[in-house]
Amino acid sequence: MDAMATTEKKPHVIFIPFPAQSHIKAMLKLAQLLHHKGLQITFVNTDFIHNQFLESSGPHCLDGAPGFRFETIPDGVSHSPEASIPIRESLLRSIETNFLDRFIDLVTKLPDPPTCIISDGFLSVFTIDAAKKLGIPVMMYWTLAACGFMGFYHIHSLIEKGFAPLKDASYLTNGYLDTVIDWVPGMEGIRLKDFPLDWSTDLNDKVLMFTTEAPQRSHKVSHHIFHTFDELEPSIIKTLSLRYNHIYTIGPLQLLLDQIPEEKKQTGITSLHGYSLVKEEPECFQWLQSKEPNSVVYVNFGSTTVMSLEDMTEFGWGLANSNHYFLWIIRSNLVIGENAVLPPELEEHIKKRGFIASWCSQEKVLKHPSVGGFLTHCGWGSTIESLSAGVPMICWPYSWDQLTNCRYICKEWEVGLEMGTKVKRDEVKRLVQELMGEGGHKMRNKAKDWKEKARIAIAPNGSSSLNIDKMVKEITVLARN
């Protein structure tokens, strides 16, 4: 842990993310940006996450910098190599029962009193109470799209109105989930299947209750932060602005960070290579360099999606038969209960046009000129990175807000093709060929439009830049009170 710079009194913000890769990445980016704006930062990870960073990025990656320190609290659960896949009930129970006291104990021992807390929205189960006990304000940072938040928010209403649970399993396939819901403000045309809900899940499921109850607490907090930009989700942002006193749309964060001159970046923070909890393989960039512009499909299903060996094999044959180059990220724990090993015959076919790696710097890959398409699980981090890079998508959502993101990618933003839930090699082949061929021309143009609109949002007078400045001013005022 680094020694804090205390020669000048600065607003002091404590960040606490939900302990998962995508949440931490989005939190760290905002923390870096506010640090560059002159705020003092304490970033709190769990012990387990802290150690994962040290393993993936080296022993000095969390040394911090003047005015930026990393701290840890124990998460109270045991961990195995597959610990985060899927999110375990034991972690959620520990968050609800153990994190409050541990977090308060940490904060009260810090050398400088904090100005405010920026909490992951899904940790509001204890951070709202912590803020009250500490006597400091809290801001909620929702590291998902505004449409994803709104979807989670209205699951309670779906249950109250009798749309869920399903009467029986036949409702999964009889067209019922195509029912259009017309009473969610700002989300015209949304279908039941587009809500962030696994419709086969018991409504008493711990993960479901945890994720749907968090937005219901949002009215207890006046400041809410969303990693999106105004022009991407205007009707939903308008609805949220009427609902809460202070809304900050601040994305895409990486584009804002890219504006910081290299000489002003703090090496003790930026050494977190890609903000990844897994060691990255740089060899894929040598392979990308050998390919023509817009000729490669990038394939990555995120850090927590899992599938059957049959599904992975179908993806493999579909990609191999498409006759397009592809970079495929296959995590060791991608397959449920088995090693992620492809059949030897398929491996031979893949060698002709494919490159397989276990992890990579996704944002660098998406920005590479050879990449022309992205086969994705539609996690929000992946989605906003793809939009920022102007790369169209093939969508295979796994769960939760990925389902909502898929709807917006394909129908509202018109930059994606949706796959069926059941993976079939012929469909994979067809969609890759459509995306990369003449059929994808309109999507490529729309993707370029969104890339430009994202850059307008982060320009000096853009909506996201102005919101970051408003947030800094608000926190500075809090520090003086």
From Swiss-Prot:
Q: What GO annotations for molecular function exist for this entry?
A: quercetin 3-O-glucosyltransferase activity; quercetin 7-O-glucosyltransferase activity; steviol 13-O glucosyltransferase activity; steviolmonoside glucosyltransferase activity; UDP-glucosyltransferase activity
Q: What are the positions of the active site?
A: 23 (proton acceptor), 120 (charge relay)
Q: Which reaction does it catalyse?
A: steviol + UDP-alpha-D-glucose = steviolmonoside + UDP + H(+); steviolmonoside + UDP-alpha-D-glucose = rubusoside + UDP
Q: What induces it?
A: Induced by blue light and red:far-red light in a ratio of 1.22.
> What UniProt keywords apply to this chain's record, in alphabetical order?
Glycosyltransferase, Transferase
According to the UniProt entry, what is the EC number of this protein? 2.4.1.-
Query: So where does an anthocyanidin get bound?
Result: 23
Query: What Gene3D superfamilies does UniProt report for this protein, alphabetically?
Result: Glycogen Phosphorylase B
Q: Which InterPro entries match?
A: Leu-rich_rpt, UDP_glucos_trans, UDP_glycos_trans_CS
Q: Does the keyword Transferase apply?
A: yes
Indicate which residues the UniProt annotation says bind UDP-alpha-D-glucose: 143, 362, 377, 380, 382, 385, 401-402
Q: Does the keyword ATP-binding apply?
A: no
Mention any additional remark: Leaves of the 'sweet herb' Stevia rebaudiana contain a mix of steviol glycosides, compounds that are unique in the plant world because of their intense sweetness and high concentration in leaf tissue. Stevia leaves have been used as natural sweeteners in South America for centuries.
- Role according to the record: Involved in the biosynthesis of steviol glycosides in leaves. Converts steviol to the mono-glycoside steviolmonoside. Converts the mono-glycoside steviolmonoside to the bi-glycoside rubusoside.
PANTHER family from the xrefs? Answer: GLUCOSYL/GLUCURONOSYL TRANSFERASES, UDP-GLUCURONOSYL_UDP-GLUCOSYLTRANSFERASE, UDP-GLYCOSYLTRANSFERASE FAMILY
Similarity annotation? Belongs to the UDP-glycosyltransferase family.
This chain belongs to which protein, by name?
UDP-glycosyltransferase 85C2
Species source reads Stevia rebaudiana
> Which gene holds the coding sequence for this protein?
UGT85C2
